[in-house]
Amino acid sequence: MTQDYEVEFVERGEREARILVRGITPAFANGIRRAMVADVPTFSIDTVRVIENTSVMFNEQIGLRLGLVPLTTDLDDFEIGDEVTLSLSVDGPSTAYSSDLVSSDPMVEAADDNIPIIDLKEGQRLEVEADAVLDTGREHAKHQGGVAVGYRHLQQVEVVGDLGEFEDDDPNILRGVIEEQAAEHAAGDATNGELVATDEFDNDLRNRYPGKDVEVSDVPNAFVFHVETDGSFTTEELVLRAVETLRDRATELKDAVQL
């Protein structure tokens, strides 16, 4: 029997998104999270050849900083193990930024232009060549395109009554996304069934349902993923590629069992 899943973007951006997935177990949700962190490859500088470095920083420190610069990655045109050469040449007084990296392939360049590498004083110079390799976060953390990936249950809020005149009115903090089921009690315009990020009401249910006593429950088999990338690719690309890796491994296991 084929399992049907429902996927919906709660918030959708190039580098940050919230995605609701229904019809999955907690184990499957964690598998998706792990795949986004460890199985989707990105380019990262791996080998650095220092031609000249008269700065105050050791060559090894320069190499470490370069290795952490996110690089744009087009997974349709490269395979794991492919390499691209970059170079950097800056004279002081000046600050060397990620934008100073010159790539041999226009498809692989710094994802952000304003990442400082080192501040060079008068008479100082930095010139290096570097090889960026395509690999996964399973091999090294610098290849993790999903820099902040987490999930939590979708939640529902039920109004069970009114707060008494002398009842405690302390903040009732909830973080995540709720599926509105008490629109008639919500402040402002609300519709039952809509998805609402809790930061829209400062994560305080008292702001959403003033004067009401509420109970919070998890929606079974429904999870909201918060996904943030380092700019190597979009959040949508990260999610799709992660799911592809899970599918490929499941197919590989199925074929092995049938031998």
UniProtKB/Swiss-Prot annotation:
GO biological process: DNA-templated transcription
GO cellular component, as recorded: cytoplasm; DNA-directed RNA polymerase complex
Catalytic reaction equation(s): RNA(n) + a ribonucleoside 5'-triphosphate = RNA(n+1) + diphosphate
SMART domains: RPOLD
SUPFAM superfamilies: Insert subdomain of RNA polymerase alpha subunit, RBP11-like subunits of RNA polymerase
GO MF annotations in UniProt: DNA binding; DNA-directed RNA polymerase activity; protein dimerization activity
EC number(s) recorded for this UniProt protein: 2.7.7.6
HAMAP family in UniProt: RNApol_arch_Rpo3
Keywords, ordered alphabetically: Cytoplasm, DNA-directed RNA polymerase, Nucleotidyltransferase, Transcription, Transferase
PANTHER family recorded: DNA-DIRECTED RNA POLYMERASE, DNA-DIRECTED RNA POLYMERASE II SUBUNIT RPB3
InterPro entries associated with the record: DNA-dir_RNA_pol_30-40kDasu_CS (IPR001514), DNA-dir_RNA_pol_insert (IPR011262), DNA-dir_RNA_pol_RpoA/D/Rpb3 (IPR011263), RBP11-like (IPR036603), RNAP_Rpo3/Rpb3/RPAC1 (IPR022842), RNApol_insert_sf (IPR036643), Rpo3/RPB3_RNA_Pol_subunit (IPR050518)
Keyword Acyltransferase: no
Family the UniProt entry places it in: Belongs to the archaeal Rpo3/eukaryotic RPB3 RNA polymerase subunit family.
The protein's role, per its UniProt record: DNA-dependent RNA polymerase (RNAP) catalyzes the transcription of DNA into RNA using the four ribonucleoside triphosphates as substrates.
Top-rank taxon: Archaea
Subcellular location per the Swiss-Prot or TrEMBL entry: Cytoplasm
Gene symbol of the encoding locus: rpo3
Assembly and oligomerization: Part of the RNA polymerase complex.
Pfam families given in the database record: RNA_pol_A_bac (PF01000), RNA_pol_L (PF01193)
UniProt source species: Haloarcula marismortui (strain ATCC 43049 / DSM 3752 / JCM 8966 / VKM B-1809) (Halobacterium marismortui)
Name used for this protein in its record: DNA-directed RNA polymerase subunit Rpo3
